[in-house]
Curated annotation (Swiss-Prot):
Pfam family, one: PSP94
Family: Belongs to the beta-microseminoprotein family.
Subcellular location per the Swiss-Prot or TrEMBL entry: Secreted
Organism classification: Eukaryota, Metazoa, Chordata, Craniata, Vertebrata
Disulfide bridges in this chain: 21-74, 41-66, 61-94, 64-73
Keyword Ribosomal protein: no
GO cellular component: extracellular region
Signal peptide annotation: 1-19
Cited function: May serve as a self-defense protein against the toxic effects of the snake venom during accidental envenomation. Does not show inhibitory activity towards brevilysin H6.
Keyword Ribonucleoprotein in annotation: no
The name this protein goes by in its record: Small serum protein 5
Keywords: Disulfide bond, Secreted, Signal
Amino acid sequence: MKVFFSLIVFSFVLATCQGACFQGSFEAKRMDGKSVMPNTCVDIFDSKKHLLVSTWNTDHCYRCECLKSGFSCCHRYGGIGYVEGYKTVDPVTCQHESYRLDDPSQRS
């Protein structure tokens, strides 16, 4: 029973550690004495502007959404454990590709 409970706890921890998300809200700006809400989101990684109700992928493997309430970004991949000497995420596809850093030709 202890082993079963430990496996459930481990599975829960593993499931919650698969990726990261963050959110940001808009701040109203004063223009001509009136509060004006922005109509674009600014990508925090490359400072590009994105229209409301749009979705984009960043060069840092995040998928971001620009909503009326603000923006949210989440990893496009689930995290797996880091193994020293191995690369686990391809920055172009944001997919897991484990291979030795000293021999990238041997991909798994």
